[in-house]
């Protein structure tokens, strides 16, 4: 069996409205759904064993269909710094065109810039920013690789799986 396309990634936020505003005002991604999880669901499904804990869940949609699912729990827990070498999610990535314009735009919006635009050995450009909660966001301009990955990616995956990357499937 094979999966379909990538659907979504979930992040916990400290302020639901601020997260919605951030993703809309900075990236033009609208909130497309909201639900509230009652305490019994928060305890049973999320494993948060705090009396009366609740969770507001929202879905923020990117052009192309991928979604960021945001979770806002009450009561809040303090944020914890997570090192990159810890197993688990490290960042999300947003594809853009014209990396230098995006860098200047994000600076003008007051977004925390972590690194300056740099060119990767494969030719695409990238830099990192953080949202208001410190979640790491990679901004990348794949340039011509966007089309290569989008249209030739499935063929490349098929070829690489049987060739140079076969050892990773063992």
Predicted regions and their residues:
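Acceptor-substrate binding/catalytic loop of class I
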Residues: 9
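Exposed loop/turn and edge beta-strand positions of beta-sandwich/beta-sheet ligand-binding modules
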Residues: 5, 53-54, 88, 123
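A short acidic/small-residue loop/turn micro-motif
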Residues: 39, 75, 121, 143-146
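Core segments of cupin and vicinal oxygen chelate
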Residues: 12-64
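A short, polar/charged loop-to-alpha-helix boundary motif
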Residues: 144-159
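Vicinal oxygen chelate
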Residues: 14-17, 31-33, 62-66, 72-136, ...
